[in-house]
Design a protein with these regions (language model features):
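Sec-dependent bacterial lipoprotein signal peptides
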Residues: 1-4
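Glycan-processing catalytic domains of CAZymes
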Residues: 36, 40-394
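Post-signal peptide N-terminal segment of mature Sec-exported envelope proteins
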Residues: 14-41
């Protein structure tokens, strides 16, 4: 996830997680676009899934405030907006001195409001953020063994290699993989979470392209170990899935859209197909949009301006989500990853009655990028070429 030591915004110096490979290789402009998929049938699974309903737009929330915990009022706002959440990596760090303790406290508070709230613990698979008692060793000026061997080294200096502010894990070290998976399992149990969100699934492969196959295999093995460590009823939400092997291991997948190139019209159509595949396997998808990645938003500074822009663009992105939404597809929306980046904004559209889709989406003109879909209580139209969407609530 593209998201300082104590303040979450500093971590935006780290690169974003890759989206699924199919998105990174969008269909050429001249190619015949893929038609939107039919709604997938629900299949039985062994793990617990978050509550899902078509009554209103299914919403996923993910946020953090590195300085503090939520106020009671903020807790109520978030709980009213979604029953599927994740606490971001620095949430509550300054207050609790350990993000694992902060996550435990917040999850307890959410579940007092609604025991069915589905809450995830955050852990990074590529960067050694020293925000919890389990990882604080990586923040030391000198990292002692065996933890030093868990980090990549700069070939010129021999010092731990950095990407932005973060030291980088060495996924090819089997002892690291064992430690990482065990730490994830311990974190899920200690916090009372319903699963884990795993960020940065690339394994720092950009540092050793010639070993991509080995890195991919090691990453997949580590996720398999993590799945075993958290237990069969807990979910493994992966930020991207770069291989069929990862798809088989993960229970849920995020489409992060870390930059504008991931939300082209071709990419969105391909993601609709991916969402169908995910649902057909009984898995979960999170379609996340940060409007701050749009070129126009780059000129906006204040939270008020960004909120206004997010409201202006909501009809398009929500329509695009609904065209491809399947059972257990969730929408995340805002302009960043902190608590102040949209998690507390109340969008009226999210509370309007939606109802289940009546049928698959249609494409009136095969040469155009306009798609429509009927829900029980809403009619949806999106023009991907124009970047415009309409939702008529019945």
């Amino acid at each position: 996830m593209g998201i300082s030591a104590c303040d979450q915004r500093v971590a935006e110096s780290t690169p974003p997680a890759p989206a699924p490979k199919a998105v990174e290789q969008p269909v050429a402009e001249s190619a015949s676009p893929t038609p939107p998929p039919a709604q997938a049938a629900e299949v039985a699974v062994t793990y617990r899934r978050p509550p899902f309903s078509w009554d209103t737009v299914p919403i996923y929330q993910m946020f953090g405030d590195g300085k503090r915990l939520l106020t009671d009022a903020e807790l109520s706002i978030v709980a009213a907006s979604s029953d599927f959440i994740c606490l971001e990596k620095t949430h509550g760090l300054k207050k609790m001195r350990c993000t694992k303790l902060a996550a435990k406290r917040e999850i307890e508070r959410f579940k007092k409001i609604d025991p069915k709230m589905f809450c995830l613990f955050y852990f990074n698979s590529a960067y050694a953020f020293s925000f919890s008692k389990d990882t604080q060793v990586f923040g030391a000026e000198v990292v002692e063994e065996p933890f030093r061997s868990f980090l990549l080294s700069d070939p010129k200096t021999g010092e731990p290699k950095l990407r932005g502010i973060a030291r980088m894990y060495d996924v090819l070290n089997p002892k690291f993989r064992t430690w990482w998976a065990a730490t994830v399992g311990k974190g899920v149990r200690a916090t009372g979470a319903d699963g884990v969100f795993v960020d940065q699934m690339h394994g720092n492969v950009f540092s050793r392209r010639k070993q991509q196959k080995e890195v991919d295999a090691a990453q997949a093995e580590m996720m398999r170990m993590a799945k075993k460590a958290i237990g069969p009823e807990k979910i493994l939400l992966l930020n991207g899935a770069d291989s069929p092997e990862l798809f088989e291991i993960g229970d849920a997948f995020m489409f992060e859209h870390p930059s504008a190139r991931f939300i082209t019209k071709e990419a969105i159509v391909k993601e609709w197909d991916d969402m169908k595949k995910i649902a057909a396997a009984g898995k979960i998808s999170v379609w996340r949009i940060g409007v701050n990645k749009e070129p126009k938003a780059a000129k906006l500074v204040s939270e008020a301006d960004l909120e206004k822009f997010s409201r202006e663009r909501l009809s398009y992105y929500l329509a695009a989500f609904l065209i491809g939404a399947q059972p257990y597809s969730y929408f995340q929306y805002g302009w960043g990853w902190t608590l102040q980046d949209g998690a507390l904004v109340e969008y009226p559209e999210f509370s309007k009655p939606l109802g289940a889709p009546k049928a698959e989406a249609t494409r009136p003109d095969p040469a155009a990028w306009i798609f429509t879909r009927e829900f029980e209580k809403a009619s949806v139209r999106v023009d991907l070429a124009a970047g415009q969407g309409e939702i008529h609530w019945h």
